[in-house]
Amino acid sequence: MYIRNIMDSDKPIYQRDVLEFVTVAVQYCAFLEGIEGKQRSEVLDIMSKLIPLLYLKGTLLPRYELLDDEEAMPADYVTEENYDIIRCNIASIMADRDDYLDVFVEDMKYSDTPVLATISENLADIYQELKNFAYVYKLGVEADMMTAVAVVKMNFEDEWGQKAANVLRAIHEVKYDEDDLREI
């Protein structure tokens, strides 16, 4: 797959902004993979810090243009089973605080009322995107790495960046809810 760099740079897959994004993406995925058994307060604390950092690093990724019609990651590492394990572990920890109302979703265009969303599904969706990206980087095939950067940036702008912003609002609400703080 051939890619044209919009910003023109030498080895763009090793630029500081890209490597910092890879680092934060790997931290996010590793935390969610080890989430089972953690307390809600710890999960909220870590996610309230990682998600804004991911968002920031996503905005700093260089934009590349794919030169052919294929716009998929070179490899899908996350299976449906992996996704469900992550989502269910988060849902179990979030329990009755998993659901939230969201107005910044595609379905809202066809509704007069907010749409029900879940913290667990949004975090798992972001996990899937970032884990697939990190896996491609781990393989070390430079052409695939370029494609992965292009795709993860494009998907940040179109999908997971909005999910990160939406779920951060819900996480903030749960983390700083006065009733929950009294229980701690």
Residue ranges and their predicted role:
Residues 3-9, 114, 129-184:
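Acidic, proline/glycine-rich low-complexity IDRs
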Residues 20-27, 46-56, 85, 89-92, ...:
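Charged, amphipathic alpha-helical oligomerization/scaffolding segments
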Residues 11, 37-40, 44, 72-80, ...:
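Short, charged/polar micro-motifs that form catalytic or ligand-binding hotspots
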Residues 8-78:
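N-terminal interaction modules that seed assembly of large macromolecular complexes
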Residues 20, 33-36, 42, 57, ...:
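Glutamate identity and glutamate-enriched acidic tracts
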Residues 63-134:
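Long amphipathic alpha-helical segments
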Residues 5-9, 24, 31, 67, ...:
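Residue-level signal for well-ordered alpha-helical segments
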Residues 3-6, 13, 35, 46, ...:
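Weak global preference for isoleucine
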